[in-house]
Amino acid sequence: MSSRETFDAFSNGKLTGLEKSFGDITWYLHPKFEGVEMKDIITSEETEGKFSFHLVKIAPEKKIGLHIHENQLETHEVIFGEGLCKTEDNECAYKSGRIAIFPAKTKREITAGAEGIYIFAKFIPALK
């Protein structure tokens, strides 16, 4: 199974216990960053605000610009594609298999490479 097929499997997966089908959840455009789509697969409503999980697609050569989450720790699991992640202190290549952890108040931006990049993002506490 390719990494893109793995991402698609998550996009159409199910949440055990609630039997929630992720395929029924609509992708939406990020309100600030062109070329970025998100799917909220587990939200604060289901976790009492404790955490949330999101699938993120960044189109080729597009980016999630410099931003910060004041209250959430965020993790990224890169499922498909390549790109670059920059923080104030570091710059690292993003590619399939890379995991990044950002404590609250960490500024970062993610730029997708030529094929785009697909990320599984998790927030503690929940983003939304």
Please name every model-derived segment.
Residues T75, I101, E115-K128:
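A short hydrophobic beta-strand segment most commonly corresponding to one strand
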Residues N71-E74, V78-G83:
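Glycine- and acidic-residue-biased ligand/ion/polar-headgroup-sensing regions
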Residues M1-K50:
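A short, N-terminal "cap"/entry segment at the start of jelly-roll beta-barrel domains
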Residues K39-D40, S52-E70:
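Conserved short histidine dyad/triad with adjacent acidic residue
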Residues E46-K50, I58-K62, E82, P125-L127:
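Short, charged/polar surface micro-motifs in flexible loops or helix N-caps
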Residues D89-A104:
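Short acidic-glycine-tyrosine-enriched beta hairpin
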Residues L66, C85-K86, F102, R108-A114:
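Short beta-strand His + acidic residue motifs that chelate non-heme Fe in jelly-roll/DSBH
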Residues P60, N71-Q72, N90, T106-K107, ...:
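A generic "binding-loop/recognition-motif" signal
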